[in-house]
Amino acid sequence: MPRVILPLSESSEGLFENTPDKTSIEQFKFFHADEGKPLATPWQVALSRAIMLREYTVPEGVILDCACGSGIQIAAYSEILKRPIVGIELNESRARASAVNFRTVFTERGDNSLDRLKDSIFIVGDGREGSQIMPLLNLDNDSIAFLHLDPARPRNSRAHALSEMAPQLDEVFRGWKPYIKCSKDGPAILLDLSPRLSSAQMIEVEDLVEEFWPNTNKTWTWTSRGRGRVDRLALWLGAIAEPDTARRFVRIPPDPTSPPFILLGGKPIAEQEDTQEPQFIQPQRGSYVSIIDAALVESGMANDWLNASLIGNYV
């Protein structure tokens, strides 16, 4: 049976792993129950994503995260969009931590009204079961304006197959489709997936989306904080996708006060992705050698960046 947690009144007693987020200017201290810290989204990444989301037309209503973990991402969405939120988490300790973390962000960033805090709710329960959760929310059936899903993946998996995700995408889509608002551009959904997905798996995700929302715009987004790795791979859908733009690369700078670098473009995902063939060219005076982010290469947009930046004058 789902259990309701109210962030306005939830106590932090019994919670642990209360550690500072070094990427936040405010030096927030977040709770991460049951070894949740390695899985949590850094505040700088969560905030950058929320600021990007603000550029799109998200319908009126609440923000839903049906596998909210420590609640950092959904707190960032609420803080930037000024919307109430619904966070669902199967693990009770993490659900409680999410509620307390949300209250921390709300109070320390100095919101003047308690309405958003009062109207937000966290639930210990199965994030797939929209029909069980909706009666607890006292909302109209189409009140979900935006769905965020970051399914858990096995830590020791190298492949991160779609069948290993929990909850699975089709189960969440089926459980929540009746309650998600749809504009002329489709639903506003963000799927935060494993950076290890192959191009074939990415196409599998796209096909799954098409089963529930045909002809929906899709923009794959690779996010990096450097260090030679892809930090996040997400699929932005419908109302929050870039029309006719299949790919986006986002580089989060080390300085949390600096804006991210964003590059749009690329080709639709293909099962056999094009590979960059090495070019053996004798360097000429005035040519450039570029050392670029590995995630930019992974996104398939390295040539887009090079052509835009150097107009072809590179080795």
What annotation goes with each model-predicted range?
Residues 61, 145, 187:
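Conserved acidic residues
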Residues 1-61, 93-141:
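S-adenosyl-L-methionine
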Residues 84-89:
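Conserved SAM-binding motif I beta-strand of class I
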Residues 60-69:
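Conserved class I S-adenosyl-L-methionine
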